[in-house]
Amino acid sequence: MKLNVNLPEHPYDVIIENGALANIGTWVSSLWKKQKIVLISDNHVNGLYGQKVVDQLEKVGFEVATFEFPEGEASKNLLTAENAWNFCAEFGLTRSDGIIALGGGVTGDLAGFVASTYMRGIHFLQIPTSLTAQVDSSIGGKTGINSKMAKNMIGTFTQPDGVLIDPEVLQTLGQREFREGLGEVIKCALIADKDLWNLLTDLSADDLVKKLDKIEEIIYRSCEVKRKVVVDDELDNGVRLYLNFGHTIGHAVENTAGYGKVMHGEAVAIGMVQISKIAELKGLMPKGITDQIRKMVKKFGLPDEYQPWDEELLFKALTHDKKARGRIIKTVIVPEIGTAKINEVTFEEMKDYLKK
């Protein structure tokens, strides 16, 4: 399966193919001339796939060095980025060379940020190995690192030269890590794909989580939602905000819990349920939709709440949200399953959305 992210200045393909990891050398050779490559990966994923990827790249003539960092959201910071910049410089990486991200969302965000800022920008590729990264963060060009104030506070818009998705690598994910990715899948269904919602409704949790039943179709449909939105609104000024359903509160949960304690997809699930509950009470979403969302979230083992729920700390984190404009935050609501809408909320009104 192949999707084309047809952006005017930087179009690229997203390849979805079982066993694709075995053909990385051929794929990269089709996109880049022989050059130096820095492979960026965390210690866990690098241990699983790093040497195989390096061997294939070297076999077709690339010179490769691997920058490895400690697994987890806590590593997505300025210190890790600086270490990566220095590593690239010591390896002699120039603007004609490239960076490959091999890993989950943290790796993709970090590697993309490093690539977009090193020497004012060099080429990079995404090889996502988590469900969250495959269906969401590897596509669209958002890169970033966290600060103590907010998630992804420092970042760029920089598109990759290509994305290679191998669903087979999901077999090495732990169940929590796989379920976390379903938070983003459920979001895609809610904002833009009712057929995907129906597919998730019909699937049993065991068939999907343990057997990866229908996983290629689920990845493809989720990527197609992301592709359409990114092509329509590359820089996040309009409809691309729909992809942030559940993220305003979700990012605040991640920040206040301490990065890594609540996984991103888990926080998105919590955020979708919480904002829907209050929006439904305000008459902005149809009666009963929150229960539908909560039922779907819980079906796949995702949380629908978080403790301790500290409204003051969450509100403080929300004030640094990237969707804020002045004293207004553009939140996302779902008028019906398969559609999304922007709902502008003042900071003061946002306090209502944090009430349990």
From Swiss-Prot:
Residue sites binding NAD(+) per the record: 71-76, 105-109, 129-130, 142, 151
Pathway where it operates: Metabolic intermediate biosynthesis; chorismate biosynthesis; chorismate from D-erythrose 4-phosphate and phosphoenolpyruvate: step 2/7
Pfam families in the record: DHQ_synthase, DHQS_C
Catalytic activity: 7-phospho-2-dehydro-3-deoxy-D-arabino-heptonate = 3-dehydroquinate + phosphate
Highest taxon listed in the record's lineage: Bacteria
Cofactor annotation remark: Binds 1 divalent metal cation per subunit. Can use either Co(2+) or Zn(2+).
UniProt binding sites for Zn(2+): E184, H247, H264
Family matches, as SUPFAM superfamilies: Dehydroquinate synthase-like
Function: Catalyzes the conversion of 3-deoxy-D-arabino-heptulosonate 7-phosphate (DAHP) to dehydroquinate (DHQ).
Name used for this protein in its record: 3-dehydroquinate synthase
Organism annotation: Lactococcus lactis subsp. lactis (strain IL1403)
Origin organism lineage: Bacteria, Bacillati, Bacillota, Bacilli, Lactobacillales
